Amino acid sequence: MNLTAYGNENIILNGNPKKTFFRATYNKYTNFGLQRFRIDYEGNRTLNYNSPTEFVFKIPRYAELLHDTYISIQLPDIWSPVKILDTPIQGNILIPYEFKWIEELGAHMIQNIEIFSGGVSLANYPGEYLSCLKERDFSAEKKELWNKMCGNIPELYDPANANGNINVYPNAMYIDQTGVEPSIRGRRLYIPLDAFFCNSSKFSIPLVALQYQEISIKITFNAVSNLYTINDVDNVVDATGLSYRMAPNPNNLDHQMWRFIQPPSDVKASLSSYNQTRNDWNADIHLVGTYIFLGQDERRVLAQNEHKILIKQVLSYDFLGVVGSKIIDIESKDLIVNYMWRFRRSDAFLRNEWSNYTNWAYNNVLPQNITSDLPFNEGVEISNPNTLHITGSMGEYSYNVKDIMLDMGIVMGGVYRENVMEAGVFNLVEKYNRTNGNAKDGLYCYNFCLTTGKDEIQPSGAMNVNRFPYVSFEFNTINAPIDKEGTQVDYICDENGNPIAFRKNVAKLNTYSYDLRVFEERYNVLIISSGRLGLLRAR
């Protein structure tokens, strides 16, 4: 019937056909082979508890090309004990630590990644960029896989609501000598490097053409104390034993990592019952690299010819303590593809809320929730048999305001490149057509290209900003709450010592401020010639 039901309308699809579903052609290709190799660090492969740890990996020449590469690290089993507090009135009170790894663990575990060769820095970007790149460019399915690889899963950051639990944390308590089941099972992370040579085989680094230089990858890890949170066991607010979540205090023995990487050996989990007080574990940090083997003819061509590879480089700029109306200058140059930026509360370090780009103290937790406590009506209590909930009083500051940025404009050479627009333009509209993903709230984008997909080989736009001394971001943020208790106040006195005025550091007027980080992606050309490597334009 399909063949007989044919008319002029079919010309749209079937007129002068160029394609058939019943015959296929293909292009022949040169033979190759893929193989993964483990790349080890020559030295101690453990992480420092209270300071960054640096690893430099020298890339061996196992094959002709280096393609996608991953950072591999083993997380330990976690036993989160329960502190038993003896009180004269209430008796024993159980206070749980409820250890949790931070969200986006794999990305925020890394402070910085640098790829260099012969003194030339090919790539230099913070680990946070990996998380932002995932948010901006990955589909929902790819994000789910990335989250599993990088440890951004409830089993690690919210065990109370994982593995079938519903708001029930799996605390670890000693029962007998057979051992204690961990609160959080250890697992191995595989963190994608996502450098320029990882996304397409066409951009792979031709090691065979680098006869006189070697590639090195330097990875700086954050301190372990920045990677987990616990219940504030020293300031319990109610009979549940729970309090606010906090970053561990490295000077407090109750907060040390060794409390959680070995099982408790008595019911009270007393400090004296632990066998060792080392805060490190066998992290077994190494790289996993995919190498490409080529045939003899293609190997000869790669080794003898000059190579020019168009790459994207990432630069980051930090502006600390911004509140209200501000203009910041970014020293951009060359061909800029896009900007990506976020604001974060300056007190995030108190809670290790590194991936929280909102005004809320805790990610996805409303500061002031609804309540069933009704106000009095002319001194008479209002009955509430149906347990209705109300929003409550706003007070002097609305802590429930979520978004930090209100609006922004982009200025180049004193001229508006983009007029001041509401934050939603950069938070929603810009992402709708220009990105493949659905970046979370608080991660803003502005593109000079048509699409930002990291797998896109063909450039789709950029802007040469060399005519301008700098690019300016003009923006407004919400106001942070005022610090009523005040900090240091300087009094201005006359010649007789009588106070006539006072002044206060503007940066300390608020209980916290906001830290702005801007990621810039720009084009550059990697040149490999005569066995050596360089960049067309220095960073």
Which positions does each model-derived feature cover?
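Short, low-complexity Pro/Thr/Gly
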Residues: 1-539
